[in-house]
């Protein structure tokens, strides 16, 4: 079966990207209902959408005003495709503006709303089926709709928003001023599910097995009989990519595992044992630790660290690939969240990701990124579907730059060792407490801060280690994990007693946002 025939057999809901940092959550929520969904540029044409043949279209939120000179628009023929359309926030305003309604600029009618608000449903609607007449939703808008287009009617309002939900059932056009994709909209999932299943008619039968078939077909079509080089980092993402690629192209895949001197304790041997031994991947192990650490000496800026590591990885691959024959592709474990955090055409860059930023312009390979439409929890599900053991699939997420971004300031062997040893203790105690599946991610950070302490009746002046532990569903938002005090106490006691050059432990209680998961 070709990639085209596989894709045509999969029902799809397309989300048009209008610039919200979290609009990809819309696609993620829809996938939870067993419906494939992905983001496309707002510049997509009606003809291009016809070729994709989606069963539904969502217009995402965004920071712009429909009146701005640089406002993101829409091909007007999209409204004539007879495909159900749901406009969210800016998307609703765009529908209104383009179809003859009225949108009032921010502040003119006291219409700004930020935070949770109560939605009052005034009429029944398939979109809100099974949800209460009054419900909490997350509003985040300045402009507001004050007159709706012909053929539309009011479904719901809020105290500060006269048109919080509208619809034209004859043309299957729906608009909501709030954000159902975020958890602060209590019945947001129900609303999106109603759109996908009841309005768009989705079967809800998309699964990771479908994804595997699609990606294998895509990889085989792209690669043909050529060869692929994969950089193994030791993390879940690159490991899953390796197994998927091997399933698709077999011995056309060569893996390079670069030991850059920034790995967790014993990680190099574990990677070789699991992937090289159990799964039979062809892995070349390269000890490039001195090469990386020399380049990183005295570098304090986190963006410079990422760029240096991203560049050097590719240069190492270049060196190794030159010893091989006919390698045309470089595979990476880039995820959806990596791309969004690195910025898109419509979204601001939060921080560059080592897989999508810092690559040199003269790179000799074409890129293959099989996971770049998946979120972290979906990658784990993919690993299980590929038959990978849980000890690999549930490995703690580990960034490509490794411990370089878990050491604040300049990197030294001494600092790296404090993080390796403290992180090993943290992971061991979390597992002993049976919390390793409940906590999304956990690791330690050398803060670069020294403080005075007393050990053995003597004065110390040593490093402060921070513990970071979070809970999350998809990695886009996160809360700090409320670890039991007795577990934290045991971890702290062990670290200060067993790890040299550490005399103080702190616990990071910051959510995302405003913080990111990693410190750098």
Swiss-Prot record:
Q: Which residues form the Glutamine amidotransferase type-1 domain?
A: 12-205
**One GO CC term on file:** cytosol
- Pathway assigned to this chain's UniProt record: Purine metabolism; GMP biosynthesis; GMP from XMP (L-Gln route): step 1/1
- Nucleotide-binding as a keyword of this entry, yes or no, is yes
Q: Which residues form a coiled coil?
A: none
All residue ranges annotated as the GMPS ATP-PPase domain in the record: 206-395
- PROSITE patterns, alphabetized: GATASE_TYPE_1 (PS51273), GMPS_ATP_PPASE (PS51553)
- The organism's superkingdom is given as Bacteria
The record ties this protein, via NCBIfam families, to: guaA_Cterm, guaA_Nterm, PRK00074.1
Q: What does this gene product do?
A: Catalyzes the synthesis of GMP from XMP.
Entry protein name: GMP synthase [glutamine-hydrolyzing]
């Amino acid at each position: 079966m070709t990639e085209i025939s596989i894709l045509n057999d999969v029902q799809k809901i397309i989300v048009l990207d209008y610039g919200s940092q979290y609009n990809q959550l819309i696609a993620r929520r829809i996938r939870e209902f067993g419906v494939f969904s992905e983001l496309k540029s707002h510049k997509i044409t009606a003809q291009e959408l016809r070729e994709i043949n989606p069963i539904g279209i969502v217009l995402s939120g965004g920071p712009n005003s429909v009146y701005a000179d640089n406002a993101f628009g829409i091909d007007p023929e999209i409204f004539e495709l007879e495909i159900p359309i749901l406009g969210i926030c800016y998307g609703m305003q765009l529908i209104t503006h383009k179809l003859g309604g009225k949108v009032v600029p921010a502040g003119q009618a006291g219409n700004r709303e930020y935070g949770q608000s109560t939605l009052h449903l005034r009429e029944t609607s398939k979109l809100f089926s099974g949800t209460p007449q009054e419900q909490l939703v997350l509003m985040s808008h300045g402009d507001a709709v004050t007159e709706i287009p012909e053929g539309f009617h009011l479904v719901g309002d809020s105290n500060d928003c006269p048109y919080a939900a509208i619809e034209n059932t004859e043309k299957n056009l729906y608009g909501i001023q709030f954000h159902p994709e975020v958890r602060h909209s209590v019945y947001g999932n129900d609303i999106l599910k109603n759109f996908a299943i009841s309005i768009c008619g989705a079967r809800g039968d998309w699964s990771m097995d479908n994804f595997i078939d699609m990606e294998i077909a895509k990889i085989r079509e792209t690669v043909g009989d050529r060869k692929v080089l994969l950089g193994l980092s030791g993390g879940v993402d690159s490991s899953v990519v390796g197994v998927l690629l091997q399933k698709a192209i077999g011995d056309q895949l060569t893996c390079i595992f670069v030991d850059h001197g920034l790995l967790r304790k014993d990680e190099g041997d574990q990677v070789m044992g699991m992937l090289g031994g159990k799964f039979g991947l062809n892995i070349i192990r390269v000890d490039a630790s001195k090469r990386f650490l020399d380049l990183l000496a005295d570098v304090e800026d986190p963006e410079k660290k990422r760029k240096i590591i991203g560049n050097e990885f590719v240069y190492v691959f270049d060196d190794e690939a030159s010893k091989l024959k006919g390698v045309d592709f470089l595979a990476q474990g880039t995820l959806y969240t990596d791309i969004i955090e690195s910025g898109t055409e419509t979204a601001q860059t939060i921080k560059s990701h080592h897989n999508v930023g810092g690559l040199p312009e003269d790179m000799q390979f074409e890129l293959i990124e099989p996971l770049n439409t998946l979120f972290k929890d979906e990658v784990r599900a993919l690993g299980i579907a590929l038959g990978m053991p849980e000890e690999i699939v549930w490995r703690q997420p580990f960034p490509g730059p490794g411990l370089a971004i878990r050491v604040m300031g300049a990197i030294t062997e001494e600092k790296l060792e404090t993080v390796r040893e403290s992180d090993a203790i943290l992971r061991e105690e979390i597992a002993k407490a049976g919390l390793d599946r409940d906590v999304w991610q956990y690791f330690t950070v050398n803060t670069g801060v020294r403080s005075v302490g007393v050990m053995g009746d003597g004065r110390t002046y040593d490093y402060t280690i921070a513990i970071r532990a979070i809970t999350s569903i998809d990695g886009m938002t996160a809360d700090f994990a409320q670890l039991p005090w007795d577990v934290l106490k045991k971890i702290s006691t062990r670290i200060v007693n067993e790890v040299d050059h550490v005399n103080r432990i702190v616990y990071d209680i910051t959510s995302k946002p405003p913080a990111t998961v990693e410190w750098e």
